[in-house]
Regions:
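Key DNA-contact positions within bacterial/archaeal DNA-binding proteins
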Residues: 40, 96
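Extreme N-terminal segment that seeds HTH/winged-HTH DNA-binding domains in transcriptional regulators
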Residues: 1-36
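Short, hydrophobic-biased segments on the C-terminal half of alpha helices
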Residues: 46-47
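Basic, amphipathic "hinge/linker" alpha-helix immediately C-terminal to the N-terminal HTH DNA-binding motif
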Residues: 61-80
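A short, conserved structural fragment
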Residues: 50-58
């Protein structure tokens, strides 16, 4: 049986992933600001994520993704970028407008839909913003 992750946890994983990709150290207050959430809500969610082996918190309260959390975050980022690619290249929505639409789609895509959409789109290697697709090994 496939384990499911809530949309809230997916949001946290993706935001931590994005901040890490930008080379930023992630702490709860930065995450609260980025997610427009109360620090107490962020703390409670991070505790659940820690319990579920998705994140680690070191002594300086820096948040990092575990291997499990990183794998899930890669998958979420891939779904998001794939949705952006579809919206921009197939539906001709301007690249600067696709983010919020893709954000909604990323949570609704099943593994089968992701697989078939990637095939339909020719296995894109870059999102419309020029970022390599997560998990792609490029030459």
């Amino acid at each position: 049986m496939e384990e499911t992750t809530s949309e809230v946890v997916e949001e946290y994983l993706l935001e931590i992933y994005i901040l890490n990709q930008a080379g930023e150290k992630v702490k709860a207050n930065k995450l609260a600001t980025a997610l427009n959430s109360k620090p107490s809500t962020v703390f409670a969610t991070l505790q659940r994520m820690k319990r579920d082996d998705l994140v680690k918190l070191n002594r300086s309260k820096e948040i990092t993704l575990t291997a499990k959390g990183s794998g899930l975050a890669d998958n979420i980022a891939y779904r998001h970028n794939l949705a952006e690619y579809f919206l921009c290249n197939s539906l001709k929505i301007p690249w600067f407008e696709v983010h919020m639409h893709a954000h909604k789609l990323e949570h609704a895509m099943t593994p089968l839909v992701v697989e078939k959409l990637a095939e339909f789109l020719g296995q894109p290697q870059f999102c419309p913003h020029g970022t390599p697709m997560p998990g792609q090994s490029l030459p």
